[in-house]
Design a protein with these regions (language model features):
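Short, functionally critical alpha-helical segments immediately adjacent to catalytic or ligand/cofactor-binding
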Residues: 545, 552-570, 612-613, 630-635, ...
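Short, contiguous acidic/charged loop-to-helix segments that flank catalytic cores in large enzymes
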Residues: 529-535, 572-576, 595-607, 621, ...
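Alpha-helical solenoid repeat scaffolds
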Residues: 3, 17, 23-547, 556-563, ...
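N-terminal Lys/Arg-rich, disordered targeting/topogenic segments
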Residues: 1-18
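Catalytic and substrate-binding regions of cell-wall glycan-acting enzymes that process beta-1,4-linked
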Residues: 630-685
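Secretory-pathway/luminal and periplasmic proteins that interact with or process carbohydrate-rich
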Residues: 414-416, 430, 521-523, 567-573, ...
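Glycine-rich, acidic and aromatic/proline-enriched surface loops and short helix-turn segments
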Residues: 362, 370, 564-567, 581-594, ...
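Substrate-binding/active-site groove segments that recognize
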Residues: 575-597, 607-618, 639, 672
Length: 694
């Protein structure tokens, strides 16, 4: 038994060294903290990522019960994106979501401010704008705070123009700036960052008309001239320079505008381009000038000879033009030197098409095979493979043609050339396009689940994932003005095209996706199929389905026409005067409707699609259901098409369409029929063996 003294000695020994326990306690605390943090990370890793494809019920469950506050906020924002017509619900969902330093906090504060403004709470909205400005001065979401608070504090508007020059709020500020000032700073800003903003053209012209002494500087006039040229007003652009020489960028922009004009303007453009190339042979604009001078099928030999040798030598466009002038001589060396260049791709097709139309099958095949398929973008590779198969069939090598076409069908999404391959193989062709006997599905097809944007920026990707597409687009614009995202790469075109379509700009968005498809080389099957589906939206489906039912015509044909005519943009007006979703001439529309229509009626997608369907029905009846003649007539008119009727249409319709003398109608017919086949097949097409994911 220990004595009390020994016990006291033992206890005192322990108490006498209190520091001995601190490392143990501290280590235990640190281990506990590490375990908690690791556990939180593990739980977060196990949490389901929220996307628009998650059901409303599941979102509400996550919003209420998730252990992760960040996920609860994401659920709230996704629910907000789905509750655009319910400001009171949005207010409840957004309450308290502006916590922390995450970029999503800035977005939540912005949405709260906008919602309070919508509900009439101006004072509360201003408080939120001020909080947003203080906490997140550089966030894309804060642009609206600079704009609204800038009404009382003009200095904030000036800061906005510098910080986020491409943001819609900055562009609106620029317009309002010129309305209250005669210094034209808004016009100068718009010439650099927002030439397509409504009202910009008038502001740019006004700035250019200001006296040179008190108006824009010489450098600013160069920018204004570029803006006007990009808007198509070459005359105002030249006038804006006040007789000073155009810098390379301005000279190129003005020349591009002039090339779209009459014969005299085209000659003026050629002179400007040649001057640009001769005076600045090393400038990047001179490469494009050489491309433009080389572009026609029948280039001007004198202009090409006048180009600086150092510039001409490194230009595949100039080399291709010289091949054309020499009737194809030395084509092989050009195609082998620049197999990755669009100028070579175009030269290859021009020479192959010429040989095909002459029935020179061996020559056509040789030219078509001069660039490996793997070097070509998907649409051009499909064209190449179809015609190689065609030349084999024409030479009696039917088994070889069959193998080529079957391979084409396995590796390319549905389009014009896969349709023709299937027709040649006897596997499938177009169904009847009109008539009471049609079995028409009026249901909009489900084309797969939501897909990610993969922009390369985490915030843009997150906002897209949460259904906040406008915020994703504005954040992307902010990035474009800060980084090298202005580089016009195919991948950036895909991202920007999808964002544009998501915010309602189908005209630009579809164009960017198509241009991307003509530059992407070597993409995997899933990317190829995804890009193809992205280019075939079902916008205005209710109006198109109704027009289809009313006229017993396939809705896929209406979609195919609308995509090519207006890119699903009802406000578009052609230079010839055609308007609306289906691009009808007012005279044609009046005849179809038994009376004149005002502008608003003709721009209405429901009215326009109904009249377009009626016109197509009459054309199908006139041509006994022939799709080639119907589509060509929609573009060029039945009178012109009547002159092109030959036996070749039945025997080799692919060659018949290539003989159409109007280049616009030739391309139009192939594109619309390709669109039609895509829409007909898109419900069932599964090109890739693995499931499409992005």
């Amino acid at each position: 038994m220990a004595s009390p003294q020994n016990a006291r000695s033992f206890c005192s020994g322990v108490i006498a060294n209190p520091l001995r326990g601190f490392p143990l306690l501290g280590g235990t605390a640190l281990l506990s903290l590490a375990a908690i943090l690791a556990g939180q990370e593990l739980l977060r890793a196990q949490l389901k990522q929220l996307t628009p494809k998650i059901s409303q019920t599941e979102l509400w469950r996550v919003y209420r019960w998730s252990i992760d506050p960040q996920q609860r906020r994401e659920a709230a924002l996704l629910l907000v994106a789905k509750s655009k017509d319910s400001p009171l619900r949005r207010q409840r969902l957004l309450a308290g979501q502006g916590w922390g330093s995450s970029p999503l906090a800035a977005v939540a504060l912005k949405l709260q401010a906008q919602n309070n403004k919508r509900l009439g709470g101006k004072s509360k909205a201003n408080q939120l704008w001020e909080s947003l400005l203080i906490r997140f001065p550089n966030a894309a979401a804060t642009a609206d705070a600079y704009y609204y608070l800038g009404r009382q504090q003009p200095e904030l508007r000036k800061q906005l123009l510098k910080l986020q020059p491409a943001h819609p709020a900055a562009l609106e500020s620029a317009i309002e700036l010129d309305a209250s000032s005669n210094q034209h700073q808004g016009a100068i800003h718009l010439s650099r960052w927002g030439i397509h903003r409504p009202g910009t053209a008038e502001l740019l012209r006004s700035a250019c008309n200001a006296p040179f002494k008190d108006g824009p500087s010489a450098k600013e006039r160069q920018d204004l001239a570029i803006g006007l040229a990009k808007l198509g007003d070459s005359k105002a652009a030249l006038s804006c320079l006040e007789e000073q020489p155009a810098k390379p960028a301005a000279a190129l922009a003005i020349s591009q505008a002039l090339l779209r004009g009459d014969k005299e303007q085209k000659l003026q453009a050629e002179s400007l381009l040649l001057q640009l190339a001769q005076e600045n042979p090393e400038a990047k604009e001179s490469i494009e000038a050489a491309n433009l001078l080389s572009e026609p099928l029948h280039p001007n030999a004198a202009l090409l000879e006048a180009l600086p040798p150092s510039l001409a030598e490194r230009s595949p466009s100039v080399a291709s033009a010289r091949v054309r002038l020499q009737d194809g001589e030395k084509a092989e060396s050009v195609l082998q030197r620049w197999p990755d260049n669009p100028a070579s791709w175009q030269l290859q097709w021009d020479l192959a098409r010429e040989a095909l139309l002459k029935g020179q099958w061996r020559e056509a095949k040789s030219v078509l095979k001069s660039i490996p398929t793997k070097k070509l973008p998907e649409p051009l590779a499909a064209r190449q493979q179809f015609w190689i198969g065609f030349t084999a069939a024409k030479q009696g090598r039917n088994q070889e043609a069959k193998q080529i076409w079957e391979k084409l069908l396995k590796s390319h999404p549905s389009g014009y050339y896969t349709w023709r391959a299937q027709a040649r193989l006897g596997q499938a062709d177009l169904p009847e396009l009109s008539g009471e006997q049609l079995s028409i599905s009026n249901s909009k097809p489900e084309l797969g689940e939501w897909t990610s944007i993969e922009s390369g920026d985490e915030l843009v990707d997150t906002l897209w994932r949460l259904g906040l597409t406008t915020d994703a687009w504005e954040t992307w614009l902010n990035l474009r003005s800060e980084t090298d995202l202005t580089s016009d790469t195919p991948n950036n075109r895909v991202v920007e095209g999808r964002l544009k379509m998501a915010v309602g700009d189908y005209w630009t968005g579809l164009s960017q996706l198509w241009r991307a498809s003509l530059r992407l080389v070597g993409e995997d099957c899933q990317t190829r199929q995804f890009l193809h589906r992205s280019q075939h939206p079902y916008r205005f489906w209710p109006a198109i389905a109704k027009a289809s039912r009313s006229n017993d015509i396939r809705p896929e044909l209406l979609l195919a026409i609308a995509k090519q005519e207006s890119r699903f943009s009802p406000g578009v007006k052609s230079p010839a005067g055609a308007v609306g979703l289906m691009q009808l001439m007012p005279e044609t529309a009046a005849e179809l409707s038994d009376g004149s229509l005002n502008k608003e009626e003709l721009l209405n997608p429901q009215t326009n699609s109904k009249l377009g369907a009626l016109y197509l029905t009459s054309l199908l009846k006139q041509w006994q259901g022939n799709p080639w003649l119907t589509v060509a007539s929609y573009n060029a008119g039945p009178g012109a098409v009547t002159k092109w009727l030959t036996a070749e249409l039945k025997e080799d319709p692919e060659l018949w369409v290539e003989r159409i003398p109007y280049p616009e109608t030739r391309i139009y017919t192939k594109k619309v029929l390709g669109n039609l086949w895509s829409y007909l097949r898109i419900r069932s097409e599964e090109l890739c063996k693995t499931r499409l994911k992005r």
